[in-house]
Amino acid sequence: MARSRKNSLVRDIASHPTIPESQTIVGLLDDSYLFDKLKKLSLAVENSDSLQRTDVSEGCSEVNGSEATTSADVKKTNKYLYYTTYLDQLNIKIDEYKVVLDQTRQVNDQLDSSIKKFRKISQDTGAFIEETKTIYEKQSKLSNLTESIPKALHYFEVLDPIMRRLNHATSPAIVKKSSFTTMLATIDESLRFLDENSDLKDAAAYRIKFKQCLIRACELISHFLTNLLKQTNQEILDKTKNKNSLTGLPSTTRDAFLYSKFYTIADTFKIQVSEIVKRSNEKAYNKYHDELNSILYECFNHYFQTRLRLLTPVIWSHIDEIVVKDKDQGLVKFIQDGKVYFQQLCADEYKLFVEFFPEKECRFKINQWFLQLCEPLYDSIRVRVLKETDICTLCDSVTLFAPYYEFEEGSEEYVKQFTDIQYDKLFEPIVQKVQARLILRVQIYVQQNILSYRPTRDVFMISNRRRKSKTSLQGGNEDATTSDDNPDPLLESYLSSFKNRSILPISPNDADDKSIDSEESTDKISQLQTYYPPLLKTLALLSKIYEMINSVVFDDLAHHVVHDCIVSLRNAYDMVIKSSAGKSDFNNLDISLAYLKNLLMLRDSIQNFNIQYTVNETYLDFSGVEGFFKSLKENGRNVLKKTKSSSILTLARELVPKVVNNMVDARTELISELRNVIKDFTESTSLELIDDTLDINSDEDLLSKNVKLRENIKARLPRIYEQILNYIDDQEIVTNLLDAVQELITQSYSKYYETITELAENGKFAKDQVADVMYLDVFTDFFAKEVADLLRNGDIDTITK
């Protein structure tokens, strides 16, 4: 048992070598029970010793005599021997453990010392590594710098040879050598290096010098190209003796001089100019774009000037031929011939240009030059346009260029349409000039044919009826086209367009349908001719100029034209109404219906033009000045006396012109005018139907007047309905007019019935008389039935016809 404990204790110490001594001792004496037993054993041993000493003095015989007693004491002493032995062993073990503990502490201290040494070695090693790394990086940097210095110095060293070569260049032909191209590449590399390494000493100064070398090299290229163009131009002039002789050459010979000769130098030119174009469009050269673009534009200008000097005599010669050929032709033919020639000319020039310059980067420049090339065309057409007075001709001229303005600029279709030559920009000056002339002629046309129109007394009479006899239609067709001896081409074109709409390719079996279409078109034209002449001219004008000018400009014009037409219609209507007052041969209902018919025609027609904008019109009102001078003329000194009595500031305020902002909205004005004429018509119709039947007079019989009212409605309403049908062919409008008349008469009858009922209650009328009068709801049903019968019979007649 003792060995096993020893082995376990040694094993425990070996596994926990750093446990302190105090903790080990406490562990051995941790058994409180054993400690108590040891205390008791100690007391017992002391008591036993004292008893033995007392017994020795009394006598040894007693001890010797009684072996049994001694044997018992020995046994008692041997009883604690195990514990004492154990205690001794514990003390020995404690001493041994103390030795082991001291050794362990010594080993631990040695380990701590070793760890500290290792840590110091690790720190020293890390510092060594960092220092070594820094030294290595410096060494690598210095090595790279050592290797890059010769390369960097190369960019600086090449400057002097390049400058000497450029400054001592005796001829621009040096640009044709391959070494010149290599030199340009070296300049590019040097500039790129200096831009990337701007922190180098004197980098800015060297960059400026290299930039000067680049500009100088590009200038040499430009001079070479200029000389090449001059030389080619001079060769052509020498062969033709003088520049005007090109116009007398055959077309094939002329093309050989103008184009074939230039094609021979195109490759050389393009190779050199591409060097400038490439650098002008390179992002790395943003700092030098101004100088490079200036040199490139100089190349453009020399090329264009050379071409223009050769082409101008030929162009003017051809324009003179067109002028002579189209002398008796109209403006449209002249523009068309010029347009065809210049289209071909621009196509040929574009084809030649892309052989001299890179197409993608330089396309914009040739399109700009085309405007200068076409100036002879602009000038010649401008002269012809200023002489043109016919609106139809001006519109047809604009139509020639319509295919170029179908798509919005910048759209995908637009880009596909103008991949090379932008014909929309090329012909835009012509279109603008023609449109400006067209707008001027439109304003003059409105002034002469609409505002200045003087209507006749019967302008709203029978000639405006919807139905006319076939004889009158056939006989009056030619005369109805115009109201005077001067035919109006615009109106004739407008009326003939209705006839042309029915002319379509047909088979022999469709002859009957063709006859029907012809009759319908003739009837349509005849019906149109019954309208107010300024109205027809307004519609003819708007339909002709629609989509011929800018939409905003058209809306502005359309508002003013429609406004002027409404003013002309209203003036004619007022004039006829005044002239018909008190005359039996005029019927106000016919006049109102004719006026309404024209307004409806105007309303329906302008919807097709999609007028969208309201026009704000600003002008100065000088009515105060005019009124002052008028008063001065009429009253003389009295005005001056009033002026003295009043404030001078008041007079000055009255004389200052006023700024008037007027909003022109033709659609709103037209709707307002329609409401007014419908109101006038319903009131006139109601008065004719009612007559004096709703006049209240105590001396008259109410029943007889009520019967007369019913008779008036039955007798006159069908006639009024016929009058409406003579002018209005829209059944919905006819129904609305009758409904408006019915509503107004019903309101009048309602007031009348309430009045006579009150009078009967007050005793002014006999109640039996009021009882004989139709009730309001009975009268309403009666009138509604009459209207319904008229409309039903009218629908049957329409279907039968």
From Swiss-Prot:
Residues 471-480 have a biased composition (Polar residues). It is found in: Golgi apparatus membrane. GO terms for molecular function: cargo adaptor activity. Transmembrane segments: none annotated. Keywords: Golgi apparatus, Membrane, Phosphoprotein, Protein transport, Transport. GO terms for biological process: autophagy; cytoplasm to vacuole targeting by the Cvt pathway; endoplasmic reticulum to Golgi vesicle-mediated transport; Golgi organization; intra-Golgi vesicle-mediated transport; macroautophagy; pexophagy; retrograde transport, vesicle recycling within Golgi. It is a peripheral membrane protein. The modification Phosphoserine is found at residues 507, 647. InterPro entries: COG3_C (IPR048685), COG3_N (IPR048320), COG_su3 (IPR007265). Pfam families: COG3_C, COG3_N. GO terms for cellular component: cis-Golgi network; Golgi membrane; Golgi transport complex. Component of the conserved oligomeric Golgi (COG or Sec34/Sec35) complex which consists of eight different proteins COG1-COG8. Present with 4140 molecules/cell in log phase SD medium. Belongs to the COG3 family. Acts as a component of the peripheral membrane COG complex that is involved in intra-Golgi protein trafficking. COG is located at the cis- Golgi, and regulates tethering of retrograde intra-Golgi vesicles and possibly a number of other membrane trafficking events. COG3 is also involved in actin cytoskeleton organization. This is Conserved oligomeric Golgi complex subunit 3. The gene is COG3.
